[in-house]
């Protein structure tokens, strides 16, 4: 597995924060690093496989990667990221208590992926721009200024994330997308889902298409197929059982959609043929 080292990304041996844009981010194999990372998705879509679990990401997704997490990107479509790298909590001279603003693992669950709306994303861009323009000076005022901006970024993300529960249409869509991540295998009635999240059906269709480039049903199908591919690789369930577990009522229809999406059959994935080619 590829290991990325801080010496290759940080401007100096003491700098606690670095900005690394990926415009766009191509598919990238599984890796980990000796630093922490906040991944901010500007726009586009892709699959983020985080510690073996696949997540669909799009504009407004924010992912918190720790120094022991492993992840990769695949199935990317104009995926543009800004990565805010930071060494460790004890690398800061003026900041303490950062863990109170970061997602925390509880009972084995780590809420690594948050979502923010487009207006917050614009504020994030402005803060990151300020961080890039502060320069590499290591005198106390310059270091303090960079650390203050990093703290402001964490506060903005914390306040604006799904966890804080906003009420505008962007936030409602974020909540809906998070709900689909957990309920993808259920029969979904879009009229009922729209009502559940206080959105009109027309707004749901328009906003999901703007965020992901996909209609609601195509987005749901892709989500199901991604989950199915994960089970094909990491479980012993039969193809038919996996199809049903992931919300498909017909295994033949599942196989047709799967091949159309990934250019491999479910059996190919089960036998690891895609990995052999790569």
Curated annotation (Swiss-Prot):
MF-aspect GO terms: DNA-binding transcription factor activity; sequence-specific DNA binding
Principal cellular location given in the protein's record: cytoplasm
Domain HTH araC/xylS-type residue range list: 174-272
Keyword Transcription regulation in record: yes
Residue ranges the UniProt entry marks as DNA-binding: 191-212, 239-262
One Pfam family named in its UniProt record: AraC_binding
SUPFAM superfamilies cross-referenced by the UniProt entry: Homeodomain-like, Regulatory protein AraC
Site positions for Interaction with sigma-70: 241, 250
Disulfide bonds: none
Subcellular localization(s) per the UniProt record: Cytoplasm
Biological process according to GO: positive regulation of DNA-templated transcription; rhamnose metabolic process
Cellular component, GO annotation: cytoplasm
Keywords (A to Z) from UniProt: Activator, Cytoplasm, DNA-binding, Repeat, Rhamnose metabolism, Transcription, Transcription regulation
InterPro entries hit by this protein: AraC-bd (IPR003313), AraC_XylS_family_regulators (IPR050204), Homeodomain-like_sf (IPR009057), HTH-like (IPR037923), HTH_AraC (IPR018060), HTH_AraC-typ_CS (IPR018062), RhaR_RhaS-like_N (IPR047220), RmlC-like_jellyroll (IPR014710)
Quaternary structure note: Binds DNA as a dimer.
NCBIfam families associated with the record: PRK13503.1
Function: Activates expression of the rhaBAD and rhaT operons.
Protein's recorded name: HTH-type transcriptional activator RhaS
Gene source species: Salmonella heidelberg (strain SL476)
Gene: rhaS
